[in-house]
């Protein structure tokens, strides 16, 4: 360390300013001591200087000037700037070294810096929004207080006018003659006075409340700002709160969707119940229709056997009549036709037979008459069969046997006739 030398020098103000302007920047003291043999004061050293003052003065003023170059605050600024430059150079070298060595760390650092910048931008925006909200709230409170003050200022004037009016009314009431004649009026005035006193108390209470409102605004504002700053210092907590709020909103939306689905399911259940009722009604109707069809079939079956029984009896009677040789030739053809109709009703005579049955069903009276006629014919045929049969001569019997086949051979021409009838129906 170099030794400090203080020399008292008295200079005029003009010379002191020239010295300050012309002094070169500071240099390391060790180099100066080596190069210059003459000892000089070190940099940034205070030197007392006596400056002349106009006019007679008992006490001489002493001024302290810096001998070499630069004042203290400028030296400190220069030293700080040099230190910052060295730090920046050192940081730049470290960054270059890191870039050359670890590109992954560089990317991570850049991402971290971007995230920090984004968070800082978000925090600044939130601060602006909060400041705007605070300004709006303060403006609203100021408006409310202004309106209350106006009301309070207007209200005392009205009260003062009422008090004066009451005082004027009380003066004539002091007379004993008037007091004795106006008791009700006095009671009314006393009530008004009590009401005015209550209003005064309310005014005082309102004034106290205004004072309390004005103070908390000033007290609570810094607390509120501190809370906001703390919140801004912890963005992670804010992000967690935001995530929680988003999750709660999603849960609410999910619950609303579930409620809508439940309502839709309830509607579908009602529709299903209605459909089940309709299906039950349809099944009941189908059962009724099946019962009706079954009844119709039974009716048809009941009507057909009567005709078939009558026809079978008629055929038996005709076969018996065929035993008579005189009637066999004319009745064989008739029997063949009837047997063909009875054996093949589905292929040959179904449409006509059905039409006849429908007509008969439409006219039951005619059917009964026909049945009665058939019964009469059958009775006549039975009577004919009961009559004795005369045996023919031997020559005639041979002729008859040659002309007419036996009972077993009667079916052959009937089958041929059935085949002929089928061919005729197909051609038609």
Curated annotation (Swiss-Prot):
Q: Where in the cell is it found?
A: Cytoplasm
Compositionally biased intervals (Basic and acidic residues): 56-76, 107-117, 162-174, 192-208, 220-297, 313-327, 352-366, 374-385
Q: Which GO terms describe its biological process?
A: keratinization; keratinocyte differentiation; peptide cross-linking; response to UV-B
Q: Where is the composition biased (Low complexity)?
A: 77-92, 209-218, 298-311
Which one Pfam family would you cite for this protein?
Answer: Involucrin
Region of interest (Disordered), ranges? 1-128, 140-398
Keywords assigned by UniProt, alphabetized: Cytoplasm, Keratinization, Repeat
Q: How is it modified after translation?
A: Substrate of transglutaminase. Specific glutamines or lysines are cross-linked to keratins, desmoplakin and to inter involucrin molecules.
Question: Which PROSITE patterns does the UniProt record give?
Answer: INVOLUCRIN (PS00795)
Q: Does this entry carry the keyword Repeat? A: yes
Key word Cytoplasm present: yes
Q: What does this protein do?
A: Part of the insoluble cornified cell envelope (CE) of stratified squamous epithelia.
Complexes and interactors: Directly or indirectly cross-linked to cornifelin (CNFN).
Q: Which family does it belong to?
A: Belongs to the involucrin family.
Protein name, entry field: Involucrin
State the gene name recorded for this protein: IVL
